[in-house]
């Protein structure tokens, strides 16, 4: 059995610069529950503490700290309170191969653990694991005032020894130092809460104390005020390295002047009546019989003392409520990010997935579901695109939606159409549109061959600009926006395949008799608009044509950048 615990201690205190592994620590903590196991573990630890390797000694102190904090209650403190010589670290102290900073960190950690054992031997109490509130004045165990003062003083001594273990944020990038620092922060939170409880208890009875006890209480309170500042700084380092530190609430630190004034007045009254025992002196009974001026002064002092007492009791009530909901630390087994008050926002940003899609706010479209009817047109939701026109003959059109494509120009044609209304004065349908064809710079235009082919791109565009139907018999007809009415059939022969069909809106005829306008916001890159205007007041007859592949790609890019959302 002895060899087992020796191997466990050696495994937990390897020379490797890393925290002790749980597979070694857990059996060691369990072994503290038996007297024989504790003896074997402490013997193995004493050997490791007398080593000359810095990491071995430092990790041995960590194991000892874990035994005090998480092992069998009181047994480790009791053992080492009678064996304080082990904390002298004679061998490593006489070696010169370690830097001064390394030795300082080792010695301060060693001194803190030694102080914990000394204070336990002096008072017989572990303030971290015992219920300190049950030992306060007026409780069942009824500590005397001297004992209460001793406990508060002991807590301040332990905290002072702890906060001397100073580490910078860069130091705590070392996982071994971070592990020890986390244990220290856990102890600091518990010790400071116990100290805060003790100070509150002393201040509650301060105005009823004897001069001797009041002076000692005032000195402890001053130390508490100074210590609070250092504790807050220490915990800020913990936040900076990612530890979850609960909000620390403590008794007010602004009572020093009031307590000193009360103590001076009480001392003067004590000197005026030396025959009366000092311990029986209270502000409520200190009434001078020499003059009415002294009588008024006593009443004033009494009211001030009562106000301070009520203030202290109210803070005590708030603190007790806060301490009941005390939070626990998160064990930083892996490096954690530093605390940021805007952490929630950063987390939301980190969770965003960027697909480099063209951003088109104020425009949403529903993807049409494939059906057997090629003339079934899905209704599109429109925000940026508003279309209001009057007509009586709807004409089917199809829209290709291509999501999740990058907004990049790859040398093909990129066009953006912008339509602006022109008033012609011809009845209700007196609006015409202006077509702006913008072609990306650095691209090639189709070669103009002057062909008479009716299906060529040049002839189709010329036909669309020249076809006007005047004198329509319908007085409510709204002339429609000129667009590029091209139907590109797929190479597979299926004219209804979604990814191969690209159609721009034909003449779209609405049933609203009120004249409207078509606004289309283009979001393309650098453009060179060429303005072409035309007027028409009748129906538009739109031919269809086969389009070369490069023109199909041009139109696909156009629709990806500015999808045409037509509401029929």
Curated annotation (Swiss-Prot):
Single GO BP term: clathrin coat assembly
Protein task: Involved in endocytosis and clathrin cage assembly.
GO CC, alphabetical: cellular bud neck; clathrin-coated pit; clathrin-coated vesicle; cytosol; plasma membrane; prospore membrane
The species this protein was found in: Saccharomyces cerevisiae (strain ATCC 204508 / S288c) (Baker's yeast)
UniProt family annotation: Belongs to the AP180 family.
Compositionally biased region (Low complexity): 284-298
Subunit structure: Interacts with PAN1 and the clathrin heavy and light chains CHC1 and CLC1.
Domain ENTH: 1-127
Record's keyword terms, sorted: Cell membrane, Cytoplasm, Endocytosis, Isopeptide bond, Membrane, Phosphoprotein, Ubl conjugation
Record's protein name: Clathrin coat assembly protein AP180B
Biased composition (Basic and acidic residues): 262-283
Miscellaneous information on this protein: Present with 6800 molecules/cell in log phase SD medium.
Pfam families: ANTH (PF07651)
Predominant localisation class: other
Compartment annotation: Bud; Bud neck; Cell membrane; Cytoplasm
């Amino acid at each position: 059995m002895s060899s087992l615990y020796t191997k466990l201690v050696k495994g937990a205190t390897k020379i490797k610069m890393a925290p002790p592994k749980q597979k070694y620590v857990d059996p060691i903590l369990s072994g503290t529950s038996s007297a024989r196991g504790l003896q074997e573990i402490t013997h193995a630890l004493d050997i490791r503490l007398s080593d000359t390797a810095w990491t071995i000694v430092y990790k041995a102190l960590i194991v000892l700290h874990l035994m005090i904090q998480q092992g069998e209650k009181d047994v480790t403190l009791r053992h080492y309170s009678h064996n304080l010589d082990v904390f002298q670290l004679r061998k490593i102290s006489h070696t010169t191969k370690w830097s001064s900073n390394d030795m300082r960190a080792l010695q301060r950690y060693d001194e803190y653990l030694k102080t914990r054992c000394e204070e336990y031997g002096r008072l017989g109490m572990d303030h971290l694991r015992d219920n300190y509130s049950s030992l306060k004045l007026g409780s069942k165990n009824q500590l005397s005032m001297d004992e209460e003062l001793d406990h508060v003083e002991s807590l301040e001594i332990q905290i002072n020894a702890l906060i001397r273990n100073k580490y910078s944020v860069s130091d705590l990038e070392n996982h071994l130092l971070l592990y020890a620092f986390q244990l220290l922060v856990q102890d600091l939170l518990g010790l400071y809460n116990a100290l805060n409880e003790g100070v509150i208890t002393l201040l509650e009875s301060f105005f009823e104390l004897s001069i001797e006890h009041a002076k000692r209480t005032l000195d402890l309170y001053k130390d508490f005020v100074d210590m609070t500042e250092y504790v807050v700084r220490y915990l800020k380092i913990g936040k900076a390295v990612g530890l979850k530190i609960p909000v620390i609430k403590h008794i007010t630190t602004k009572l020093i002047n009031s307590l000193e004034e009360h103590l001076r007045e009480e001392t003067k009254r004590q000197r005026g009546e030396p025959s009366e025992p000092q311990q029986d002196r209270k502000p409520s009974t200190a009434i001078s019989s020499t003059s009415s001026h002294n009588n008024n002064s006593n009443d004033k002092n009494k009211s001030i003392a009562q106000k301070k007492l009520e203030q202290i009791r109210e803070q005590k009530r708030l603190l007790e409520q806060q301490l009941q909901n005390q939070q626990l630390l998160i064990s930083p087994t892996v490096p954690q990010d530093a605390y940021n008050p805007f952490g929630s926002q950063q987390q939301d940003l980190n969770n965003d997935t960027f697909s480099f899609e063209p951003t088109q706010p104020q425009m949403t479209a529903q993807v049409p579901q494939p059906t057997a009817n090629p003339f079934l047109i899905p209704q599109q939701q429109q925000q940026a695109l508003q279309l209001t026109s009057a007509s009586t003959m709807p004409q089917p059109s199809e829209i290709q939606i291509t999501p999740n494509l990058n907004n990049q120009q790859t040398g093909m044609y990129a066009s953006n159409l912008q339509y602006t209304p022109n008033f012609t004065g011809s009845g209700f349908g007196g609006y015409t549109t202006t077509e702006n064809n913008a072609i990306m710079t650095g691209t090639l235009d189709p070669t103009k061959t002057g062909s008479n082919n009716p299906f060529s791109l040049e002839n189709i565009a010329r036909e669309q600009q020249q076809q006007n139907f005047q004198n329509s018999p319908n007085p409510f007809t709204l002339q429609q926006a000129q667009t590029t009415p091209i139907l590109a059939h797929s190479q597979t022969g299926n004219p209804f395949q979604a990814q191969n069909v690209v159609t721009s809106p034909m003449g779209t005829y609405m049933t609203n008799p009120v004249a409207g306008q078509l606004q289309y916001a283009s979001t393309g890159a650098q453009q060179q608009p060429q303005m072409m205007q035309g007027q028409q007041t009748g129906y538009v007859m739109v031919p269809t044509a086969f389009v070369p592949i490069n023109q199909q790609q041009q139109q696909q890019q156009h629709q990806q950048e500015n999808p045409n959302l037509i509401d029929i």
